Amino acid sequence: MAVPKRRTSKTRKNKRRTHFKISVPGMTECPNCGEYKLSHRVCKNCGSYNGEEVVSK
């Protein structure tokens, strides 16, 4: 079996893991009510999407 010859240093480990990060979700302001919502999704506050009321409240 393959066994590491040297211990992996903290620096080398951290450099390898630079791309393992959580991305921030794209938040936009709802043009209807002004609340922040996720992009390309129905607004939870007023139920509108793309200027039309999709979910009645």
Curated annotation (Swiss-Prot):
Alphabetized GO MF terms: structural constituent of ribosome
Entry keyword annotation includes Transferase: no
Gene Ontology CC annotations of this record: large ribosomal subunit
Statement: the UniProt record of this protein carries the keyword Ribosomal protein: yes
Signal peptide: none
Coiled coil: none
InterPro entries associated with the record: Ribosomal_bL32 (IPR002677), Ribosomal_bL32_bact (IPR044957), Ribosomal_zn-bd (IPR011332)
Biological process annotations from GO: translation
Pfam families linked: Ribosomal_L32p
Disulfide feature: none
UniProt keyword terms in alphabetical order: Ribonucleoprotein, Ribosomal protein
Matching NCBIfam families: rpmF_bact
Family that this chain belongs to: Belongs to the bacterial ribosomal protein bL32 family.
Protein name: Large ribosomal subunit protein bL32
Organism listed in the record: Staphylococcus epidermidis (strain ATCC 35984 / DSM 28319 / BCRC 17069 / CCUG 31568 / BM 3577 / RP62A)
Gene behind the chain: rpmF
